[in-house]
Amino acid sequence: MCRKDRFSNIAFSAAHKSVQRYKHGAIATKNGKVICEGHNDGMRTKVLNNYRSCAHAEMVVAEKIIKMLKKKYGKNYKNYTNKYTIWVVRKSMHNSNEKNLKMYESKPCYYCTKDLLKEGFDKIGYSNEDGEMVVQRLKDIDTSQLHKSVLQLQTEKFY
């Protein structure tokens, strides 16, 4: 099993712990080793000093890494966040059948991408629309498209 598959499987397992409808799981790795894991949480929470309506899995993991690095390096923690890769996947079930578990798109949203960049993270692995893992530098993610989709979601009316 290649590294990408191994990491996506671990993040997929973390997603199972989520109680949200869209289950996202994430891990942080360094030098091929899993450092921590997390999943999305629907509770209003403070992530990286910003209050959010929910905590996205990648931000839960980033918060854990930052907390660990701040303890060790203090204010200089941002000099070390680029050594970690965050992996995030979205797990979904069709027909509520455990056999039909699949990975779906989990590309980080506009806000998560911006926050991760601001904190000095460099790379992220995420499941694409085909359920395959993509590894990309955060600075190469087209946030204009992500922002557009977030704005569309905010203006949609749900009846």
Where are these regions (language model features)?
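Short, basic/aromatic recognition patches
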Residues: M1-Y22
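Short beta-strand scaffold segments in enzyme catalytic cores
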Residues: K23-E37, G125
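Zn2+-dependent cytidine deaminase-like catalytic core
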Residues: C36-Y159
